[in-house]
């Protein structure tokens, strides 16, 4: 009931390690080390707690299986109808995700027999596009504030309770910062749906501190996570609906900028069922092939059109599942004799390294090169940032032309 000051207050506390147990106080020896025998009994006596040694001995006699298998379950959901984005529709993948999430959420909100969709947020609903869901399903939206590590744990734990647990955040926060918590979600066979926005170089003026250029490599360290990097709004919509229903941990990763739907002859190429592990050919070509990660497929198609003007017909594959290598697409690409992988990810540890390593294991032969992020990116409009990194359409075309010279 005292007076409140309208300014920040810092409270400093001096604590005592091992407080309450005389032989432990101010000694680091017992950090991670249990007292045993007479010392344990003395500690329990000083703390006023019961001696549980006899009970523990009885528990040790019980028989437990050496291991138990935990099988994540597919959610019972009405996924609604996928939206179609046409040639005139330019939007960002974030908005396509948010729209699909809100629709599925509303279709199943408080419906008997349907899995509840629970969405977690860390003060970024406007940026990660979960605001529409919050309006339509207010009781299923949890605002956690700026507590990314806690939220990663909570979202993973919630998935064990029979709900579809979704957490959307920037890539650097949801994965890079909360890496160990996501690792534990993998260990525990959770069912979190992690949506990472602002990945790669596509963060605008926020610059290098917010450029998550290692998400593929971080996810590749896990054994059970599925990673999807949609190529355009159509694929984002379908991948979102697929992820919400799919058992286990699933990560969707996308950038910030608006981009057109990938089309051919005025028809959307990715307005089709999403299949995990499929690299979709979005442009035909016999002279060379580009394997492009996620939204880089759009720039790769533009590069292929520039190359076509010079008589080089280049196939383009939209690689949306970098951890699940499509060996059919990889083999097809290598049959052209010239393969360029393109990604706005650390070039050393991204999709290119994974896919070319697999090509070697399969005994595929071709001139191949990786194109990607080779230093921390700049701060500025995305198009300028990509150009400075050598990842604009014209720079991609130049890189492939140079590679073709090596192939001769």
Give the label of every model feature segment:
Residues 1-253, 258-259, 393, ...:
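Thiamine diphosphate
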């Amino acid at each position: 009931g005292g007076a409140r000051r309208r300014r920040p207050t810092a409270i400093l506390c001096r604590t005592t390690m091992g407080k309450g147990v005389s032989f432990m106080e101010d000694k680091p020896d017992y950090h991670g080390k249990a007292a045993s025998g007479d010392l344990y009994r003395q500690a329990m006596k000083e703390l006023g707690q019961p001696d549980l040694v006899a009970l523990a001995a009885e528990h040790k006699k019980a028989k437990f299986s050496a291991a138990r298998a935990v099988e994540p379950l597919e959610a019972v959901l009405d996924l609604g109808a996928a939206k179609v984005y046409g040639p005139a529709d330019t939007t960002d993948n974030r908005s396509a995700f948010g729209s699909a999430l809100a629709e599925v959420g509303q279709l199943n909100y408080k419906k008997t027999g349907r899995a509840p969709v629970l969405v977690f947020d860390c003060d970024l609903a406007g940026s990660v596009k979960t605001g529409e869901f919050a309006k339509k399903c207010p009781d299923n939206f949890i605002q956690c504030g700026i507590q990314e590590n806690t939220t990663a744990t909570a979202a993973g734990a919630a998935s064990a309770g029979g709900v579809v647990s979704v957490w959307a955040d920037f890539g650097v926060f949801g994965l890079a910062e909360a890496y160990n918590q996501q690792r534990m979600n993998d260990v525990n066979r959770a069912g979190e749906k992690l949506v990472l926005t602002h990945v790669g170089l596509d963060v605008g003026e926020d610059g290098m501190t917010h450029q998550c250029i290692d998400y593929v490599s971080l996810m590749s360290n896990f054994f059970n996570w599925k990673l999807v990097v949609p190529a355009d709004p159509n694929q984002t919509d379908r991948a979102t609906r697929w992820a919400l229903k799919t058992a286990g941990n699933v990560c969707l990763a996308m950038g910030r900028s608006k981009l057109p739907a990938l089309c051919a002859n005025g028809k959307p190429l990715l307005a089709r069922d999403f299949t995990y592990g499929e690299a979709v050919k979005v442009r035909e070509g016999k002279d060379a092939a580009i394997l492009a990660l996620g939204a880089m497929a759009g720039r790769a198609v533009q590069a292929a059109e520039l190359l076509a003007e010079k008589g080089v017909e280049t196939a383009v594959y939209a690689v949306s599942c970098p951890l699940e290598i499509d060996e059919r697409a990889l083999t097809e690409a290598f049959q052209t004799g010239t393969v360029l992988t393109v990604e706005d990810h650390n070039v050393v540890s991204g999709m290119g390294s994974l896919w070319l390593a697999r090509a070697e294991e399969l005994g595929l032969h071709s001139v191949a090169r990786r194109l990607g992020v080779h230093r921390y990116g700049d701060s500025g409009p995305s198009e300028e940032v990509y150009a400075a990194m050598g990842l604009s359409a014209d720079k991609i075309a130049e890189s492939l032309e140079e590679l073709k010279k090596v192939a001769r």
